[in-house]
Amino acid sequence: MGKGGALSDGVIKKILLSYTYVAIWIFLSFTVIVYNKYILDKKMYNWPFPITLTMIHMAFCSSLAVILIKVFKIVEPVSMSRDTYIRSVVPIGALYSLSLWLSNSAYIYLSVSFIQMLKALMPVAVYSIGVLLKKESFKSETMTNMLSISFGVAIAAYGEAKFDTWGVMLQLGAVAFEATRLVLIQILLTSKGINLNPITSLYYVAPCCLVFLFFPWIFVELPILRETSSFHFDFVIFGTNSVCAFALNLAVFLLVGKTSALTMNVAGVVKDWLLIAFSWSVIKDTVTPLNLFGYGLAFLGVAYYNHCKLQALKAKDAQKKVQQGDEEEAGKLLEERESEAAAKRNETED
């Protein structure tokens, strides 16, 4: 094959690799969600201890992150002072622990399909909190789109066959804490030039989460676990569940590193629809036509929001390229003038 053929082969390999990363991420994300539901649901494995499950994940993930960074040196740790850690990482760790605790708790009360529908509110929460914290500028067009997403989720909630108020409150709380965490990452870390990939995030944040979760665990779940004499720690169940949770973080690292965050958003939409289909067909959760209509409306709003973000990123990149081109042209002109001035000086000396 010629040069063009070799180039085509390279492009095809890159596309296939990207699709492979997407498929791995969807599979692992799907597996972790269904596995957590299986463990926590009283009708399945019947182990309704979301704080303990989250702590097991955090202990396992932080241990492996330390091994990957300190022993195998797969990624370099970020240089961070104690003051920066306390001011920036600790608040993010607190929010992350609350988000995981509440989202895992919701699996006890709500179906997998309905939880995915409620998660469609994430862009609404991120944008609203971003505006409140002056990280995002208020735009009436964007806010109208956010309202359409909220309206779609409200319709889906109205059509939910097994609506549980407490479960909905837990999931909405998880969305609010997660959205605040995402905005604070931009304010406290990204703005300071600190970029954490999923592995370094676990290295710094997971131990912090473990500490924050320990205090509610002592009062909420530990007394019940002590009374449950029949309970024995199943290393196969909790071990494989923790491995899946850590593998998911590695998959995020690969997906964002080799493709883009937008690809992950699109893959997330595919995963949500697959989970809804799985919840309905395998777990036998009830999915009503009103559920699907409401979620479909919210889905269109989220898709439009992602499209607008992509266009904004493209415009920003194009502007950067124009600025770089102008700077290069100005540099060339300056070099030419300096060369001309040097030539004139040489002529005068001669």
Swiss-Prot record:
It holds the Pfam family TPT. It comes from the Eukaryota. InterPro entries: Sugar_P_trans_dom (IPR004853), TPT_transporter (IPR050186). It is a multi-pass membrane protein. Signal peptide: none annotated. Its main location: membrane. It is found in: Membrane. Keywords: Membrane, Sugar transport, Transmembrane, Transmembrane helix, Transport. The chain crosses the membrane at residues 15-35, 49-69, 89-109, 112-132, 146-166, 168-188, 205-225, 235-255, 263-283, 286-306. Residues 38-155 form the EamA domain. GO terms for cellular component: endosome; Golgi apparatus; Golgi trans cisterna; plasma membrane; trans-Golgi network. Disulfide bonds: none annotated. Residues 324-350 are annotated as: Disordered. Belongs to the TPT transporter family. TPT (TC 2.A.7.9) subfamily. This is Probable sugar phosphate/phosphate translocator At4g32390.
